[in-house]
Each structure stands twice: as structure tokens, then as C-alpha cells.
């Protein structure tokens, strides 16, 4: 995991920059939490799909009928899961940044 952590952090930053170009900072903690929750739900969905495809792959392996199509699905869904996890991290950073920005403007 350490071999790619720095790369993932860069991808989180890239996702955050893209989101910030398209959408304003969170207006409240409630809004930020709702967006993070939505991203977590999407990540959970992809994880459930990974589990399903792996179970089918494992069933095929145990029956000696091959499991490549299911393993290809595991690969695809795992990549989707990684993207969703990056979005969760980016929105968590946006939450932090939004709160700091609101605190700064309240002090003025």
C-alpha cells in the first residue's frame, strides 16, 4: 500500500481540484456531511459488487470451470471502488477546507 499512497494522495488532490472547479465550497457542515455520506454509499455499493463477483469467481474456481470473467469483473469493480474511495477522501478534504474558510470569514 505504501508504494502507491503518494500517488493516491495526488489523485485525491486532482479530484478535489476538479470538484472545486465545478461546485462551491460546502455552505455548512450538514451539506458537507451529506456529500461525504453519498460518496461512502457509492463506495459501499462498489465494494458489495466486488464481493459478489469474487464469490462467483471462487465458486467457479472450486468447480474447476475457470473464473476469468468473474475476476475481470472483480478488477473492474475494484477500480471503481478505488475511484469512489478517492472521492470520499477528496470530499473529506473539501469539508475541512470549507469549514476553515467559513471560520476565517466569520472572524472578519
Predicted feature locations:
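Flexible "arm" and connector segments at domain edges
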Residues: 1-108
